[in-house]
């Protein structure tokens, strides 16, 4: 009986995450999440489940669906929460992408240590995702589809997002709902063909299934094979990153520039996916980066403005700034070179003696300005130090100085006033 595939999938989940784990269930009230929540309640205590309904406010029935979800959770004895999110500024990404982004932001913010996020994506969803990504020319990351388990990096913690029904076919989910006489809500927007996924679901995939009855399963197999290939590429990227220098905002190519472009591209992809928040690479960015790497002019300082932030390239180093802070004024104990995204993560405490510790009260850290150095020899020496230290030009213009009572007493990494 096909409905048992759902129960087997939930049994696999419980084996993977034994008690006392908590489950955060993305619960829309639709067929898929209703089946997942019901099956989960048959295997674990309802007290270990927290169901969350994300209200985008895009449909007139949104509040009614929230009420239906609340009543369903009350019947099951499950904690319920309805979260309102605002979907706006859709000119660039489209309403589907923005709604999905807002939904996951809300869900991820509620995942804590010891809690697993569950979403009800199934085999048909995987087939749709694979074909949608193929249609937009995605690389191997997109063609590998949705993973069964995805690690989430949030607030220096690694949390997990699991899709327990990912290998379950849609017929089995319908069969489960029929077997246990479940009720669910129907979103009328799922029939609107203006949405790309709906067009694929209602117009394209039925024709493919008619010719190839097991196409959903085969698409899922292809995604799985590509996921294995992606894992190998990630391992290669980790090896390459060991030979270079990087943080969450820059990647140096100095020691790896002799590698072929495809390998550098793979390393850059992995770096952004693993360490950089808010940056999504595309063909245009890759082309720009390749041109930067091939540029033989050491004085070149290419820059690329993005919808969010900007990319810069200097001295074989790629930088990503989401908000480059040019103006700042910080108390001494608030200063953090990494937070300011300075290439040299230096610290004033490294150049100040213990005797100077008592003199720090009332000091502030601010950017360097042209009048901080009075003599030409000092300016020349600082310029030489910047060059030898390979400090990018934009960092030179905002380089930190320590000031007390209107006087510069130290320049980060370069100078400390003798009388201080």
From Swiss-Prot:
It is found in: Cytoplasm. Its main location: cytoplasm. The keyword Cytoplasm applies. InterPro entries: Lysidine-tRNA-synth_C (IPR012796), Rossmann-like_a/b/a_fold (IPR014729), TilS/TtcA_N (IPR011063), tRNA_Ile_lys_synt (IPR012094), tRNA_Ile_lys_synt_N (IPR012795). Keywords: ATP-binding, Cytoplasm, Ligase, Nucleotide-binding, tRNA processing. SUPFAM superfamilies: Adenine nucleotide alpha hydrolases-like, PheT/TilS domain. GO terms for molecular function: ATP binding; tRNA(Ile)-lysidine synthase activity. It catalyses: cytidine(34) in tRNA(Ile2) + L-lysine + ATP = lysidine(34) in tRNA(Ile2) + AMP + diphosphate + H(+). GO terms for cellular component: cytoplasm. ATP binds at residues 28-33. Signal peptide: none annotated. Belongs to the tRNA(Ile)-lysidine synthase family. Ligates lysine onto the cytidine present at position 34 of the AUA codon-specific tRNA(Ile) that contains the anticodon CAU, in an ATP-dependent manner. Cytidine is converted to lysidine, thus changing the amino acid specificity of the tRNA from methionine to isoleucine. This is tRNA(Ile)-lysidine synthase. It comes from Hydrogenovibrio crunogenus (strain DSM 25203 / XCL-2) (Thiomicrospira crunogena).
């Amino acid at each position: 009986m096909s409905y048992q595939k759902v129960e087997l999938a939930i049994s696999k989940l419980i084996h993977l995450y034994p008690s006392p784990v908590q489950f955060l269930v993305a619960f829309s009230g639709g067929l898929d999440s209703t089946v997942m929540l019901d099956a989960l309640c048959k295997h674990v205590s309802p007290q270990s489940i927290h169901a969350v309904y994300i209200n985008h406010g895009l449909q007139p029935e949104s509040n009614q669906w929230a009420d239906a979800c609340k009543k369903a959770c009350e019947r099951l004895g499950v904690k319920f929460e309805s979260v309102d999110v605002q979907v706006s500024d859709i000119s660039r990404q489209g309403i589907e992408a923005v709604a999905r982004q807002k939904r996951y932001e809300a869900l991820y913010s509620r995942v804590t240590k010891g809690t697993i996020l569950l979403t009800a994506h199934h085999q048909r969803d995987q087939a749709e995702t694979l074909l949608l990504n193929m249609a937009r020319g995605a690389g191997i990351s997109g063609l590998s589809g949705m993973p069964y388990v995805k690690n989430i990096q949030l607030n220096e913690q690694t949390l997990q997002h699991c899709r327990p029904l990912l290998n379950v076919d849609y017929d089995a989910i319908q069969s489960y709902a029929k077997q246990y006489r479940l009720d669910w809500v129907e979103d009328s927007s799922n029939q609107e063909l203006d949405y790309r996924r709906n067009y694929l679901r209602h117009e394209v995939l039925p024709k493919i299934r008619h010719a190839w009855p097991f196409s959903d399963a085969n698409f899922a197999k292809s995604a799985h094979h590509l996921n294995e290939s992606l894992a190998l590429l990630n391992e290669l990227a980790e090896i390459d990153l060991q030979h270079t220098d990087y943080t969450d905002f820059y990647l140096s190519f100095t020691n790896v520039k002799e590698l072929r472009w495809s390998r550098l591209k793979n390393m850059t992809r992995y770096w952004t996916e693993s360490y950089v928040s808010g940056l999504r690479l595309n063909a245009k960015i890759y082309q720009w980066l390749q041109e930067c790497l091939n540029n033989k002019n050491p004085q070149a300082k290419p820059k690329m403005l993005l919808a969010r932030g900007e990319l810069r390239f200097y001295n074989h180093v790629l930088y990503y700034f989401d908000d480059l802070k040019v103006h700042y004024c910080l108390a001494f104990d608030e200063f953090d070179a990494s937070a300011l995204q300075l290439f040299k993560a230096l610290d004033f405490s490294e150049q100040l003696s213990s005797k100077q510790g008592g003199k720090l009260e009332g000091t502030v850290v601010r950017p360097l300005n042209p009048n901080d150095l009075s003599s030409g020899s000092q300016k020349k020496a600082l310029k030489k130090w910047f060059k030898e230290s390979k400090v990018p030009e934009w960092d030179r213009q905002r380089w930190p100085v320590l000031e007390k009572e209107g006087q510069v007493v130290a320049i980060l990494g370069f100078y400390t006033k003798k009388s201080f």
